[in-house]
């Protein structure tokens, strides 16, 4: 009979850990949380010191009964849930749900599921860390306060299936703010001017870029200015004024944190944050490897630390020495510096054993699991390697009073780039043809002027949103992926070609939250709340202080919104469309996916159809109405009502005015009207409305 009971979170770990520990240990899984706040009520009483009321999660009764049977048999119980706040809270709930007060109970944690790590954790068993538990409990209660109090209010007042969340509402606002920036952006014209010059004795010309005058750097803002510069240099002598040789190093990247893994997997592998975390969970919990059984391939996946254990540092140094050579090794990598709290009981995400090279286990892993493992393996090896080294040359060329420059680089030593390159590492070397000496004269061949327009800020992708959330202090490693998944699932945002767009539903929800609950969607407020939760974890802040300060203000805001938001209840709006089934005038209704037309004769008549909002502008192709439409994923655009017969379509709202230069439609962008033809580039201010 087993003398010791080990309780883990995931059933996927049970077999592996039991194999490590032997017959004296019984290993069972809690399958996540076993207790939570009740769904049907707030779950705590503000009048009684905010003490939470936890109940057994529906469906967990039989599991707890099985665990209690094993508890009775065991001399010692080891709570081995995940090594973070959530895991600590699950251990605490297990302690009370299983009534372990009279038993010998120990908390153990490990950052990787390997035999050494699991056995070492038994030697370092400790008590449950109540600071971690309190931090998780405070987060859970804050999230419950926002969701339970605000979501029903928005649903009742707006009638669109809206709901709110403490972190998700801020993430939505970040995306909405970017959308506003993009819509208000006015492109500005600028020009580049390259000159092709021939070096004496060389066949291939070199290309230098316009810099400015001998007095200052300057840009070119129009074709006329570019033409003027070229005309002024007609017959001019192009002379090399300065040649500088130097060196440049490109440092190795840091090993992955949760955030950087999600970003890189999105950019390189085109994985969603949710998919990345699902696959990383499998790699952490264990994969069947021929000859070894189930093996945990990476360390714990929810971390904001770049720290690496001494054992892993030693193995990396030895591995690099053997496979790449002494010169590829580097001193201990500089660790991530951050003013915010980093949960440094954790390590960076890394392979548990570098000798399990990706190519050696490729055939034993599904394709996407292999690709993610390879990415993590290469990134970690590269992070322990020396910098790449380049020889650089910069050249200044003068013609009359105008300056052109060129820069060239040649890789001298590849360092970490022999293993791993990121998107921004993939720069082509610009090698000078021949030697350039100061005061040498170059033969002019041609100018190459090009027109450009400034670009608006890019739409957020999942990767850049995660980066923004991390930089702003919104959420933590465990919340990035669930937050994005939630606002996508609720159709507040839509994803097209990796880009995230706000839907009409998202716009309405964000506007209402800004109006009624400005602090909830305030980035700084939310970041400060995260910092306070970190303070609870560190033992410097009491959890009840946070919730007791937060709830009264929220309660007051909800009561105020119940009065103020009453006026924005949306009544059915009558349309010009007549129901072809019963002859009634159809009304505009609102559903989870936006507006649609419905017959007011419901339930006798159940006719519905898509709603297209006419904007009062004629299609330039066929003369019929232009209407506002939505893509399948909810992004707004403007197209001909006669689609698919007519394919006219633009992303910005047509104004009805025509461009005085080219005759095409002018589109509304912020307080400007811009020509729909970017090559035309015409821009003017919107007419001021008369009061």
Model regions and ranges:
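Intrinsically disordered, low-complexity regulatory segments
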Residues: 1-137, 211-212, 220, 227, ...
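C-terminal or mid-to-C-terminal helical accessory/interaction module adjacent to the motor/catalytic core
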Residues: 113-195, 245-246
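Short acidic, hydrophobic short linear motifs in intrinsically disordered regions
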Residues: 240-243, 251-265, 292-301, 456-468
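Conserved short loop/turn motifs at secondary-structure junctions
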Residues: 82-83, 159-163, 245-254, 266-269, ...
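Basic, low-complexity terminal or inter-domain segments flanking catalytic cores
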Residues: 2-4, 16, 25, 97, ...
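Alpha-helical scaffold elements adjacent to nucleotide-binding pockets in ATP/GTP-utilizing enzyme cores
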Residues: 16-20, 66, 89-97, 117-121, ...
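Metal- or metallocofactor-binding catalytic centers and their adjacent structured scaffolds
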Residues: 215-254, 440
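Core structural elements
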Residues: 139-149, 167, 197, 248-260, ...
